[in-house]
Amino acid sequence: MLVPVLLFALGLVLLIKGGDWFVDGATGLARRFHIPEIIVGATVVSIGTTLPEVMVSATGALNGQGAMSYGNAIGSIICNTSLIAAITLAVRPAPVDVQSMKKPVIFFFVAAAVYCFAAYGMGEFTRPLGIVLLAMFVFYMVVTVRQGIKTPAPQGEEPHEDGTSVPLWKELLLLVVGAAVIAVGANLLVDNGTIIAKELGVPETVIALTFVALGTSLPELVTAITSLVKGHGSLSVGNIIGANLFNLVLVSGVSVTLAPFEVPVGKTIFGINSSLILDMPLMIVVMALLTVPALTTKKLHRWQGILLLCIYAAFCAIQFGL
């Protein structure tokens, strides 16, 4: 049991570090070729920070572990919203930019409606669903890039912290090594997460919804804490909303397109599949609790954070039968 736990932890570390390297390399290359900063942030960085979830879900799907793919994507959304964003709101509520929040929120709920239609209507996540979700991702990227295309592009090479330019070979190395490390970390996480689930006698879905989801959400947690310390709580919440959208359209889209799978049955509540009665409804409820009050009052409130934290605690208790 000790070895799988250590390898699981190593997988998490590799995922996070690999993601850092990939983003650093990709961002450096983008700036080197004078791509506007807003486009870099909306595409390269956003995709890079979502790579841990993409690789874990894709690896799980290809290995025939649909429960791991599903749990990681949905669990990350629940964790991002009712734990990470909730901490930010509970500690330091802040005003929000309604206009910048509207687009990702609308895209998220439309994608969630499509996702839930497949789950409740067909009982499975099919390849056409994956293609639709990926098409939504591409459309969102195109809209975002078009909005930011007028932003002046930075000139010259990206300087390092000491004022020197970062060499091209280093940026390429960070990109390639980062991607490879993410792939290795994802395999370690999925394989050993499955072993741990069997040893503990709990469904893979539970492990994926909790431990794996929290682990792959660590980059968002670090960003949230950093933003909180610097007094930019609304920025943190904006990043989390974007990450949630990507978890639904990119992470789920990739995994389902590669290897379709049925809605997992991890456990039942009142004789009904918990995926249908708890996980997916909760995903929508916590996002609504986060975004609707913010859009209507133009402010994030402390009560939202406290309520979301209570919901997350109850969710974990139910998953582990406490």
Describe each region flagged by the PLM.
Residues 1-322:
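Hydrophobic alpha-helical segments, chiefly the membrane-spanning helices
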